[in-house]
Amino acid sequence: MSPNNQNEYEIIDATPSTSVSSDSNRYPFANEPTDALQNMNYKDYLKMSGGENPELFGNPETFISSSTIQTGIGIVGRILGALGVPFASQIASFYSFIVGQLWPSKSVDIWGEIMERVEELVDQKIEKYVKDKALAELKGLGNALDVYQQSLEDWLENRNDARTRSVVSNQFIALDLNFVSSIPSFAVSGHEVLLLAVYAQAVNLHLLLLRDASIFGEEWGFTPGEISRFYNRQVQLTAEYSDYCVKWYKIGLDKLKGTTSKSWLNYHQFRREMTLLVLDLVALFPNYDTHMYPIETTAQLTRDVYTDPIAFNIVTSTGFCNPWSTHSGILFYEVENNVIRPPHLFDILSSVEINTSRGGITLNNDAYINYWSGHTLKYRRTADSTVTYTANYGRITSEKNSFALEDRDIFEINSTVANLANYYQKAYGVPGSWFHMVKRGTSSTTAYLYSKTHTALQGCTQVYESSDEIPLDRTVPVAESYSHRLSHITSHSFSKNGSAYYGSFPVFVWTHTSADLNNTIYSDKITQIPAVKGDMLYLGGSVVQGPGFTGGDILKRTNPSILGTFAVTVNGSLSQRYRVRIRYASTTDFEFTLYLGDTIEKNRFNKTMDNGASLTYETFKFASFITDFQFRETQDKILLSMGDFSSGQEVYIDRIEFIPVDETYEAEQDLEAAKKAVNALFTNTKDGLRPGVTDYEVNQAANLVECLSDDLYPNEKRLLFDAVREAKRLSGARNLLQDPDFQEINGENGWAASTGIEIVEGDAVFKGRYLRLPGAREIDTETYPTYLYQKVEEGVLKPYTRYRLRGFVGSSQGLEIYTIRHQTNRIVKNVPDDLLPDVSPVNSDGSINRCSEQKYVNSRLEGENRSGDAHEFSLPIDIGELDYNENAGIWVGFKITDPEGYATLGNLELVEEGPLSGDALERLQREEQQWKIQMTRRREETDRRYMASKQAVDRLYADYQDQQLNPDVEITDLTAAQDLIQSIPYVYNEMFPEIPGMNYTKFTELTDRLQQAWNLYDQRNAIPNGDFRNGLSNWNATPGVEVQQINHTSVLVIPNWDEQVSQQFTVQPNQRYVLRVTARKEGVGNGYVSIRDGGNQSETLTFSASDYDTNGVYNDQTGYITKTVTFIPYTDQMWIEISETEGTFYIESVELIVDVE
């Protein structure tokens, strides 16, 4: 059904953004759907376009029922709307709501459902007596809470009535004691994880109850001491309950870690459901403190919640399709690393561009699936629309479909998944997704439809509804029904078992709608802004995973400097004054500074924890700034800095809280500065750029022109803009680099790059797009450098000319810059982040003052020398004689090999500097002669290695078409040829292994031929995996047997007499075969390789340590001997057994091949 039982959806144009034809139906943007669609909901449409089987709707892997999760989400949402000290009537209605949610009726057992679902998820049963006891206690608590709620309502109707006051106060005390006695029943040893969701809901109610003592205690007649004791218990239990929930959540999650995709799915679902039912509640616990929050309070949850991967995952008898999570080759850590985002600043999705690929399956040319194979996201930070970030996932193709969110939230996604499968191959993909959107603050809905065609069987398709996992309340208008908005989309692509199964699936990431998109600060409420909702994090600061009770990630800094900036929106009068406090944890005392324009607030914050201690509830404390302040603008920006502590100490920031407390001379100077900057770009004749002018300087001049007053100097601004636009055109025309503005990374032309590089727009340092390069990735024991490169072809170069690579580095650590031709030029840049002032100058509307900022930047650059820490860089490369056949061209590259490294860079250009002459020309000519001599040597070396490798490969084949292997070829011949091929030099570039070298073509030619030989070798051997390259696959082996890598060869090792290896396989009866075994025996005793058929015919080859004295073929280098025996089986089934009597038996290969003699 459509959300809120409505079909009034706008359908946004689903046309691809390229000219590539699409199999999808196309819809115009319209307020009313077409006649053919106006009565059709998304399920009907998906069935029409994708052949959906209506019996397969829903997600069978959803462990926690939608109604149960809706209960948890509803309770959290209701609490978020009643934080601080709410009106008394709100408290009474809140308890009524809670009772209705957790104890809806005698026929509906929410608590039992929670227990059963968690039992299923962790594959463990709650013992009967424990469950019965817990359910009995919960029933009693529900009854008591219902009575208390009714008594509270009675008293609130007449607060002066002594009898109702006495009743409610007595029932408060009785209910508190009920909780104290009942809660241990939800924390039974051995059942902590199973009962965790029940425990969290129960202790949440207890803390809310204790809050009532602070709100109503005085009116009920409690003494100040009694009220204080209730309050102190509440504070103490808040810490105790919080730490308990986080501890057992982590223990439960850790127990679900595994190695397979199936174990990952269980782990993933537990994480999601426990976040919604447990951790979201825990994050709200401290807000019940009426001393800290005596007025209405806004809190926010910034954690990410991931729905299940959108991939076919049901067991069906239809065709050959299988659930994706049952494939053993898809590993736990692969999926986790690909689909779960690392800790990050809170971001807001702006647009989605989906890339489509066409897949097929082996031996069926008519079968196909057009599916979602990758996507590009654009997103921004909170309250900041000036900087756009881009993230690419999966495969980027030419067929694209895109849509922008603008002022809308995606609140539900319904997707069709398909498994195109036959006996030989399985393809997984998403051919359709329906994105349901609502205009923020209204119930006006639109929808975007991504739809592609496929030929998968009906029973091999499935519909995923995000509302199965993050439910919607269909009983209220859309604006009130959704609790989460789509914030990101990750993905995982896989190709396993030689592409026997392959595919790609997106994973939708959601954030809670309590996370305000504008960082709104209210004049009549306490406003909490999580630290991850900053718009910029300065270098050295990091986002780290939250401890579990903060509702999201937190910020960390280990050295004194600026932490970051926060854009805010003030809702109320600018005359209102505020006091600020910070929730933090720290291993050291430090000074915290807040900057707001000219206002600077400082305070000394104390250490809260010891070095090496874990982050617990008690390690986080609040500290306030003493003086209050006013905001200057409705849209304002705050900068936070930490100082006066030793590097290596740790400071964590959870959130910032704002508590409301009862033009002509400068314009002329700006014009003169802009004129000077623009004039400096051109030659005296104004028809070309001045030599040495960089693209960065052109952009910065444009910034100065942009800041000129439209009112005072409209004509001057127009003329200067025309001039700077011409300068930009000239700058682009001379640049030999493709895609210097970073429109696309890893596209068909231009830049090739490693993963993780971000394209960023609109930064204060860079006017246009620039790149953010992360440090090298560490995976297991391997380090994978971050790299970016492109080639400038020989055809665009001039002979005997100097070119120069230039660019601008905002900041960097360990950035290596290369130009490569016959030789490699390299520089390393370690550039401090010191261009901008600590507090950015702003205009009256709160935006960054580019003119003032440019003056600061210029002053910094003017005093900068050309050392390794300079922001600008320039790297020359001289071109001599051109060789279009060799096409060496110029390779431009950037690399970071240190995991701690980073860089931001832009305005990259490769420009012609001028012809070479004099000493420079003579030096280049000498270098070229030396290069030619060196190349002659390299070619001679290459020819020797190549001819030896080619001859070795040629000897493997009996024909010139490489279709038949020589009958006497053994595995040693293949490995010898492989070693020769690997010895071919200059296959890849020395600095960038991703760049092909001079012998890449020869190397790949021989590698492909060798692979063909391996394939033929495997095909002719009647014994599967006879060379043990696939370990013990196909073999039956006792536990002590293993396959070892010895001299780059897979060798079966039988270490003891009681170990054995065997296999049953199929042959052609009455066909003459030769059993050929290459093996080596160590120590006393014999090794045996025996074969037999179903007619009890058998042959045995015996190996001993003294085989070098007997017949057989002996390899002096390896110590292995090859023995053969002829065998004619009578049956089609044969058996082989390998064993030994003593010592160790090494078997390199076992072959049973047709005797061609």
Curated annotation (Swiss-Prot):
<dbReference type="InterPro" id="IPR041587">
    <property type="entry name" value="Cry_V"/>
</dbReference>
<feature type="region of interest" description="Disordered">
    <location>
        <begin position="1"/>
        <end position="29"/>
    </location>
</feature>
<dbReference type="Pfam" id="PF03945">
    <property type="entry name" value="Endotoxin_N"/>
</dbReference>
<dbReference type="InterPro" id="IPR036716">
    <property type="entry name" value="Pest_crys_N_sf"/>
</dbReference>
<comment type="similarity">
    <text>Belongs to the delta endotoxin family.</text>
</comment>
<dbReference type="GO" id="GO:0090729">
    <property type="term" value="F:toxin activity"/>
</dbReference>
<dbReference type="Pfam" id="PF00555">
    <property type="entry name" value="Endotoxin_M"/>
</dbReference>
<dbReference type="GO" id="GO:0001907">
    <property type="term" value="P:symbiont-mediated killing of host cell"/>
</dbReference>
<dbReference type="InterPro" id="IPR001178">
    <property type="entry name" value="Pest_cryst_dom_II"/>
</dbReference>
<keyword id="KW-0749">Sporulation</keyword>
<dbReference type="Pfam" id="PF21463">
    <property type="entry name" value="Cry1Ac_dom-VII"/>
</dbReference>
<dbReference type="InterPro" id="IPR005639">
    <property type="entry name" value="Pest_crys_dom_I"/>
</dbReference>
<protein>
    <recommendedName>
        <fullName>Pesticidal crystal protein Cry8Aa</fullName>
    </recommendedName>
</protein>
<comment type="function">
    <text>Promotes colloidosmotic lysis by binding to the midgut epithelial cells of Coleoptera.</text>
</comment>
<dbReference type="InterPro" id="IPR036399">
    <property type="entry name" value="Pest_cryst_cen_dom_sf"/>
</dbReference>
<dbReference type="GO" id="GO:0030435">
    <property type="term" value="P:sporulation resulting in formation of a cellular spore"/>
</dbReference>
<dbReference type="Pfam" id="PF17997">
    <property type="entry name" value="Cry1Ac_D5"/>
</dbReference>
<feature type="compositionally biased region" description="Polar residues">
    <location>
        <begin position="15"/>
        <end position="25"/>
    </location>
</feature>
<keyword id="KW-0843">Virulence</keyword>
<dbReference type="InterPro" id="IPR038979">
    <property type="entry name" value="Pest_crys"/>
</dbReference>
<keyword id="KW-0800">Toxin</keyword>
<dbReference type="Pfam" id="PF03944">
    <property type="entry name" value="Endotoxin_C"/>
</dbReference>
<dbReference type="InterPro" id="IPR048645">
    <property type="entry name" value="Cry1Ac-like_dom-VII"/>
</dbReference>
<dbReference type="InterPro" id="IPR005638">
    <property type="entry name" value="Pest_crys_dom-III"/>
</dbReference>
<dbReference type="InterPro" id="IPR008979">
    <property type="entry name" value="Galactose-bd-like_sf"/>
</dbReference>
<dbReference type="GO" id="GO:0005102">
    <property type="term" value="F:signaling receptor binding"/>
</dbReference>
